[in-house]
Structure formats: structure tokens, C-alpha cells
Amino acid sequence: MGKKKLLKNYRTTNLINTLEQVDYVVLAPGISFIKNKNLIKYKNKIITDIDLFYLINRNVKSIVITGTNGKSTTCKVIEHLLKKNKLNCFLGGNIGTPILDFNKSKKNYIIIEASSFQLFHSKFIRPDFAFFLNFRNDHLDWHGSKSNYFKSKLKIFHLQSKKQFAFINKKFKKNFLKNKFLSRLITSKQREYKKIKIKIDNDYLTSKINDENMSYVYTFAKLLKISDKSFISSMKSFKGLPHRFEILYKKNNITFINDSKATSFAATEIALSSIKNIYWILGGLPKKNDKINLTTYKKNIIKCYLIGKNISFFEKKVKGKINYSITRNLKNSIVKISKDIKLKKLSNKYLLFSPAAASFDQFINFEKRGEEFKRLCKTYARKFI
């Protein structure tokens, strides 16, 4: 159907008539409910693809994971853990295969990454294991407020029964209890995990957010009666996801890290707090209401390199706080860093691309941005270092 014909058939009046006649409307996550008056009127009919999955599959063991940062990596870690321990599983939702492509034959568990957009509309999501990893300011342009964003995350627990498990950050325990959710509240075994993590020695799991989220995974492993020996062995072989604190290679005490997925400062903070002696590439399309405060992290940053079409915005944030250069694009940044990095004699140095901004000013998505960074590192940085 052509665009003109589609618009003719689905003008506002026709759309409202359609909404009145159907039982449910499966809404795409990118559509802002708050900004559409017609959708608000029919909010009780709006569901998501995950809801539809639960309506179709009533007797499947499900693990649903949400949180501002680290959802995808945590999903992949749990998938890896289950497979290594000979437990069949399916990974879907916002990562991997679309959730409605799930085939339940011979699958012990389904792992679902759920966004705040999906949880906002959720009416049938009832995980056996629900993880609310963390919460930071993000997606406020979609949700309208921090309060709405937080309430969306909490909806992961709404339909759980007394036999199901809720993994939640200690900071939000009061919120959980206030809502009188029925599920069994599980707090992560952080102390126990710290004792064994030294035996894992996996660069892909070294960032502070992964450290925090791994304690949830360890706690989950204990519920499944997976031994420490099996857990350590499984985690040693885990390979991280592309563009998420992705360690490209190490050379002459210099580590190259691709963190292109960091599209907000809240995400970049994790990288800045996890390492020191950083040559940091920053810039892109800043998110609405994103606050950049370098007070805590400036001691870890040797120099910053500003890229993208919003240089003035980022320059105001770093000027007078850290040393910086305006390099405008990734190629110039890598060439400049390759020269600057030789000036400091330090045992360990990090070339970190964690832009703290969306990619759309120069790239179509964060994946393309990350791939370009990797290509340039291979082409230029290795020649100079």
C-alpha cells in the first residue's frame, strides 16, 4: 500500500473507529503514548509484544530484566550461564530474536530484555524471575518525568505471585514494600560475589555496572543451585557485547575501549568510574535534561577530545574542569590521542570512546558509530602506538 493510500485509510476518524472495535492494540515501543491524545483515551487497550507473548505462552519459565544500564549484557550473561550449565534457554525482546518468534519446545527458560517503554504499557507481564538492576535519569523525553520513568520500571513486579522472585537494588527496597508486591524480594549477594570475582578474571566484566549486575546473576545462580565452581568457569568464558565497554585490544600498556552504546552521561559515568588515566572521546547529540558533572571523575581523565555537531554544548561542560581538545570527528581524535598518549609515562592508559550522547548528528545509530571507531583504531592508532 502506498503512503498516500495508507494515510487516506487511516486518518484520525478511521483510526478512532478501529480502536473502538479491537480488543487490544499492540503498540510499538517508539511511539510516545503521552503525546498522543487518541491513544490516551484507549490506554486500557494498549499492550506490547511482551504482553502478547504472555497471553500465548502461559506455562513457560521466564526471566525478565530491566534497568537503565546493563540490561543487554546481563541478559547475555544469564543466557551464557544457563547454556554452560546445560539448561536450554531462549533470549528475546529488545535483544536477540523478536519475542514472538519464540518456540517453546525443549526450552527450560526464556530470557526477556524489557524496556521502560514496554513496561509502561504492560498488562500481562508476570516473570518467574524479575530483575530491576538500576535506575538513572534517561528517556525523560518519552516518559515526561523521572517519576513516570521509575513507575514504569516497577511494573515488572505488578503481576508476580508469591512463588515468583523479585531481584531489586537495595535503594528501591522501600518502593517495593510500599507497593505491596506479592513476589519474594531478593537482594543481591554482593559480599559473596566479591569473594569469588577475583577468580573470574574477565576483562569484559570489569566495569562498575557489570560488577553490580553480576552480583544479581550470582544470586540467581545460587537459587538455581549452580555451584561456585560452575559459576566461575562459566563467567571466565563469557565474551562481552559489542559497543558496551568493549575492549578491542591492548598494546604497550594502552587499552582501546569502544563504549559507543553510552548515549547518555549516566551511561558514560560507569566507564569513567571504572578506569583511570583516560583519553576520552566525547560528543554527539546530547539527550534532553542530561546532566554532565565531572567532579567525581576528573581525576581519572587525562584529556578529553570533543567531536560531533554540538561542540559548544560539550565545551561548556568540560571547560575549566579537564584538559580538552576540539577534534570534531573520530579520525582526528584517534590521530591526536595517538600523539598525546606518548607524552605521559604511565603503567596503564586507556583510549576510551564513551560519547555520552546519541549518534544521530553524524551516524545512523550507535552500532555504526562503534564500528567506525573500531575501523579507525585498526587503521590509525596501531600505526602510532
Task: Describe the predicted segments one by one.
Residues 1-3, 49-52, 170, 181-196, ...:
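Beta-strand->loop->alpha-helix junctions that form or flank phosphate-binding loops
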Residues 1-5, 241, 260-330, 356-368:
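Active-site beta-alpha connecting loops in nucleotide-dependent enzymes
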Residues 2-14, 192-202:
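Adenosine-cofactor binding site in Rossmann-like domains, unifying the SAM/SAH pocket
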Residues 8-21, 329:
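Short acidic low-complexity segments
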Residues 16-23, 29-166, 170, 174-183, ...:
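Phosphate-binding loop of NTP-binding sites
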Residues 25, 65, 94, 133, ...:
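Residue-level signal for inorganic ion chemistry
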Residues 88, 203-301:
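Nucleotide phosphate-binding/pyrophosphate-handling subdomain across enzymes
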Residues 333, 337-374:
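A glycine-rich beta-strand to alpha-helix segment
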